[in-house]
């Protein structure tokens, strides 16, 4: 039996993502194999994992068992007999804990979002700027800052402006070179408007955001030298802002004199208006054109703001020419933003464009556990799975749910259990359960790909029908709580292995095919309203 489980685990590990294998397969324990009855019993550590493994992986495990023993094997999944003892041992740790604002460290107040800053990335390449520029900048920056939301630069910052030669862009790396542990003064974060809390260390990575994180790490290590601009897009609360703050914080740790500015697009529009009203636009342009890193959030707010777009275009051109890094976020793909000048759209497309997708189940669980850990609160794993299974859209929704659970537990003096969680989130869960159905997914995909809804259930296999059907199966798996057999039944009584094949095929191709990824993003946004 142990030989079988070793071989089966190795096979499943090769088929699943590392996070899926670690979450679902590794915790399983083979209990016994009855040769006469040809029955294999496998234990799961808790009820949630038991139910999920039975619905998602039982067919594959049974297939492996039948191949191994060359017979029809009945695989039975049961709750680990020792699970109750472990749960009892954990009870003292699950007592309610006084609430803190989510995101604050124990014993520390929540940090406010800071404000704009100063100079170059690579100290070895620094050389003084011309004195005329230095004197003019110092004389005018103070005046500008009084009326416009632009920080003042001191003489050392201005004179340290770097001029970089254009190097060849290196390939994406998935590791982050550790910056020297330089002390970064709070005033630097204040001027840059970087949130010190948002770093790579506390960014939870999964299949949905791994490419975006890899690109962000590459840019942090090689600002202005690789992907420029870096354009991150995705729905609300998926981590775009976290990633760009992480890049800025990494650069500041590496060089506290780096001239960095994080700004929301709406604030940039406001600053442009103020600059014209105060007749201080030369100062405004001088500041923005001299940055080493510009992080601009939610660029879609430039829509219809023609004057702002024109000024941003010139700032963008100046920064790129100086090999300064530009990072942009938006809620949609560049070419889908309405009311933006074609010149800007083409500039956004000239760098690297990366989508951040809604987090998958395992990633949502990891996010919840990490947020709870930051609050010094113990949340049982099965509770995290319960919440993650029902709330699928974004990280902020998960954070909000965790706040409600902690508040409910604290106010009522109850331990955090699935029953308490269900009661705390009853309104939210009711709304979620009304949302996306497989039938709605089928209709949306049929309309999108111009086929009949009936084709979703038919046995027809032409590529123009089979492909949309596979995409609909993938979305049904990602966006609903249906099991593979249930999805198969709703697609004309297909076997769960057919659904599994479609899900894996589309998930794999999505990471390689930009057009498919874009189509899926549009469908997901449409279904979520």
Curated annotation (Swiss-Prot):
InterPro entries cross-referenced by the UniProt entry: AAA+_ATPase, Chromosome_initiator_DnaA, Chromosome_initiator_DnaA-like, Chromosome_initiator_DnaA_CS, DnaA_C, DnaA_dom, DnaA_N_dom, DnaA_N_sf
Coiled-coil ranges from the UniProt annotation: none
Region named Domain II: 72-192
Binding-site positions, ATP: 237, 239-241
Annotated S-S bridges: none
Main location: cytoplasm
Function: Plays an essential role in the initiation and regulation of chromosomal replication. ATP-DnaA binds to the origin of replication (oriC) to initiate formation of the DNA replication initiation complex once per cell cycle. Binds the DnaA box (a 9 base pair repeat at the origin) and separates the double-stranded (ds)DNA. Forms a right-handed helical filament on oriC DNA; dsDNA binds to the exterior of the filament while single-stranded (ss)DNA is stabiized in the filament's interior.
Similarity remark: Belongs to the DnaA family.
HAMAP family: DnaA_bact
Name of the molecule in the record: Chromosomal replication initiator protein DnaA
Protein's organism: Ralstonia pickettii (strain 12J)
Top-level taxonomy: Bacteria, Pseudomonadati, Pseudomonadota, Betaproteobacteria, Burkholderiales
Underlying gene: dnaA
């Amino acid at each position: 039996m142990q030989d079988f489980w070793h071989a089966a685990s190795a096979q499943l590990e090769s088929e699943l993502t590392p996070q899926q294998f670690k979450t679902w397969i590794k915790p399983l324990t083979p209990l016994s194999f009855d040769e006469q009855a040809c029955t294999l019993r496998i234990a799961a550590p808790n009820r949630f994992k038991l139910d999920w493994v039975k619905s998602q992986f039982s067919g594959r495990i049974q297939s492996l068992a039948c191949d191994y023993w060359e017979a029809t094997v009945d695989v039975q999944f049961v709750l680990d007999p020792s699970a109750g003892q472990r749960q009892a041992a954990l009870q003292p740790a699950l007592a309610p804990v006084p609430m803190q604002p989510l995101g604050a460290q124990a014993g520390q107040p929540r940090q406010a979002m800071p404000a704009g800053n100063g100079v170059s990335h690579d100290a070895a390449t620094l050389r003084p700027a011309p004195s005329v520029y230095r004197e003019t900048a110092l004389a005018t920056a103070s005046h500008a800052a009084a009326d416009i939301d632009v920080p003042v630069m001191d003489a050392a910052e201005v004179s340290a402006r770097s001029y970089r030669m254009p190097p060849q862009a290196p390939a994406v790396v998935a590791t982050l070179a550790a910056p020297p542990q330089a002390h970064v003064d709070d005033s630097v974060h204040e001027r840059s408007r970087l949130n010190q809390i948002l770093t790579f260390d506390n960014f939870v990575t999964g299949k949905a955001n791994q490419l975006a994180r890899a690109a962000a790490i590459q840019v942090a290590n090689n600002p202005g030298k690789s992907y420029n601009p870096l354009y991150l897009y995705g729905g609300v609360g998926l981590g775009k802002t976290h990633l760009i703050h992480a890049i800025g914080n990494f650069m500041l740790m590496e060089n506290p004199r780096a001239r960095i500015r994080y700004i929301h697009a709406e604030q940039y529009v406001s600053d442009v208006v103020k600059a014209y009203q105060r007749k201080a636009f030369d100062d405004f342009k001088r500041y923005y054109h001299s940055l080493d890193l510009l992080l601009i959030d939610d660029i879609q707010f430039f829509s219809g703001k023609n004057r702002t777009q024109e000024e941003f275009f010139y700032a963008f051109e100046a920064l790129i020419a100086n090999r300064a890094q530009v990072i942009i976020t938006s809620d949609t793909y560049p070419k889908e933003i309405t009311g933006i000048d074609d010149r800007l759209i083409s500039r956004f497309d000239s760098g690297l464009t990366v989508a951040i997708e809604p987090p998958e189940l395992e990633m949502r669980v990891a996010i919840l556990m990490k947020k709870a850990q930051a609050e010094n609160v113990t949340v049982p794993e099965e509770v995290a799975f319960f919440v993650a299974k029902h709330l699928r859209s974004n990280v902020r929704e998960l954070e909000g749910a965790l706040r409600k659970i902690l508040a409910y537990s604290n106010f009522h003096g109850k331990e955090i259990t699935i029953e308490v969680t269900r009661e705390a989130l009853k309104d939210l869960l009711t709304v979620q359960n009304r949302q996306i159905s497989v039938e709605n997914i089928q209709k949306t995909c049929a309309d999108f790909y111009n086929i009949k809804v009936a084709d979703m259930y038919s046995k027809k296999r032409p590529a123009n029908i089979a492909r949309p059907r596979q995409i609909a199966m993938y979305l049904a798996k990602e966006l609903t709580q249906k099991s593979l057999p249930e999805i198969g039944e709703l697609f004309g009584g297909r076997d769960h292995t057919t659904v599994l094949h479609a899900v894996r095929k589309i998930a794999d191709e999505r990471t390689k095919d930009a057009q498919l990824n874009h189509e899926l993003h549009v469908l997901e946004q449409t279904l979520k309203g």
